[in-house]
Structures are given as C-alpha cells and as structure tokens.
Amino acid sequence: MAKRETIVVVGTGARTPLGFDAASSAAAIRAGISAIQDHPYMIDRFGERMKVARDTGIDMSLAGPERAVEIALSPALDALQSLAVARQAAKVSLILSTGESRPGQKEGFAAQVSAKLRSRLAEHIVLEGGGSTAGGHAGGLLAIYHACKTLRDGKAEFCLAGGVDTYLEPETLEWLDENEQLHSEGNIYGFCPGEAAGFCLLTTLTIARTFGLQPLLEVVGASVASEENRIKTETVVLGEGLGAAFRFLFEDAPIDPVGRIICDMNGERYRGNEYGFAVIRNPGRFKDAADFETPADCWGDVGAASGPLFVSLITEAEARNYQRTPLSLIWAGSENGTRAAVLLGGPRSAA
C-alpha cells in the first residue's frame, strides 16, 4: 500500500481562561494553576454561586456569536502567524466547530460564528472553502480529522482547523444545572463550565517544505467513531465508540506505546467509565493508561475547543523540551455520540 502523505502542524493558537495565547495557557496548565472561580451573579440550585472558568478579557455583557468570535479571533491569527513569513502567498481553508445546539446556543450558531470569523480573518488572509459544524466536545478534533482528509485529497494547501465554545450564557448555565451537570459541593460529579478557542494550521509535509515552514508536530493519525450508549440516557456505556476510535487510530500507527494522553474528562463519571472500557478494548497500546491529563481541572470544560487546545499543549512541550514521549494521544467525546481521537508525533518524526 502506498504511503500516505504526511500531515504536519505548522501553527497553533490558544485562548483560554488561563491565558490569551498558547504559551501562557500551557505554562499555567503545567503549573497546575486553576482559573475556576465563582460566577459574578449566577446561582445554582443549592443556593451557591456557580463555579465557572471565564475569559476575563471579554466583557460579560458580550454574548452569542459575537462573544464566540471575540474569543476565537486572536488564537486563529496566532495559528496563521507562520504564513506571515512564508515564501509565497497562501490560501487557507477554515474548518470550525462550536458546541452542540443547546439552550442559549440555538440551531445555526456554528454557521453564524463561522461567517463572522471568516469576515474578520479575511482582513489578514485569503480563505477558500472549509465549513462549520456544531460538533460539541469532539468538534475540534473532528475539524482536524476533516482537515487531514481535505489535505490528502488535494483540495487545499493549508487548513485552519479549530474549535470555539462558551458555556457562559445564563440560559446554558441554568440548563446544565437542571441536568445536574454543574460541579458544586452538592454535586461533585459535575463539571465547571468554561470558554475558550483553539486552532491548528495544518498542511502536508511537502507543502510545508515548499513554503519554508518548520513542522511543529506530525499528525500520525486521526479517527472518528460513534457511541450509541450516550450520556444522560438510561443506557450503560461500555466504551464501544471510544474503543473503536482508538482501534481505528492504532491500525496504521507505529508499534510504540502511547506515552502521553490528554483528554476532555471533566469530572462526569460517564466519561471516566467510558475511557476505562476503551482502554481494555485496546490492550498493549499504552505505557500507562492511568497516567492521563485532564486540563478541564484548570481551564474548565471548554467543549469544542478541547482538541486543538490539546495540540497546543503538546507543541509547547516540544518547543520547550519537556515532551518526554514520541507519541501522544488526544481524545474527546460529544454528547451526541461522536468520539474523535488524534495521534501526534514530534517534529522529528516528520523530518
């Protein structure tokens, strides 16, 4: 079988409650700093202020698609920065995901955010093609998956794949509280809602060399699967969907065991149970499956932004020489059943 075209990351951008760029966000995560705080005015069903992680650089009065775009703009531009010194003009395909449709975030939200963000980015770069989806937690990784396919099919030279999410609409917070998903002293298995955006600029290794760009990481593989036994239902999850996503990923992967795992587990028991079963379904593929990182402990649950933000954590570790393993696995799961996983290798593997 012919060798597939190598996909590489040549730019990343991040904006989180911990920092307004990838470097500061990664440093805060590494130091274990938490941005979780009391909401200024929202009260939960126990009479306590809701625990959230918010972007303090954006006024709380800014809401809806406009808030999401304001969060997304700077990290998108950061991810594109490498093209500013490229040898020639480049055209970029934007693939964006937001959170799933929910109270406070109606149908059409993703399309609105995408259109507004495209308009802002068009002042700096030529955008061609792409798309948007309300993909939920797995959405950012789903964007990376589709970007890899787009690049390998020769439909674009560069893909800007990203996710942006914000849970801080009052209607959304009330809905989470009603569903017993908010973390509090009275509900230890809930999560702390956050807001963030993350982006990755992807291309083939051939194009990167043509443009004189230095790869930051190699995308060793990307996979998508579906889970039928979903959260907030009467069914029992046995890790079939996530286990399949891992299996698809490992089919064409190096035999080396995964040494670093970053995921979107957020305190909900469902996610922990699912991961445990998924690992059992893929024996021998992890150095230590119990040694995983959950950034939501620090920057809150950031939904669709999770995957691209995980990529930025690894690029920062590589850049500062504290990445200790050649293979990293990042994964996330949406409430709609979508499961996505990406396997990343260091820049040396792409050379």
Can you annotate each of these PLM segments?
Residues M1-G136, L142, K149-K155, V164, ...:
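Conserved "HGTGT" condensation-loop signature of ketosynthase/thiolase-family condensing enzymes
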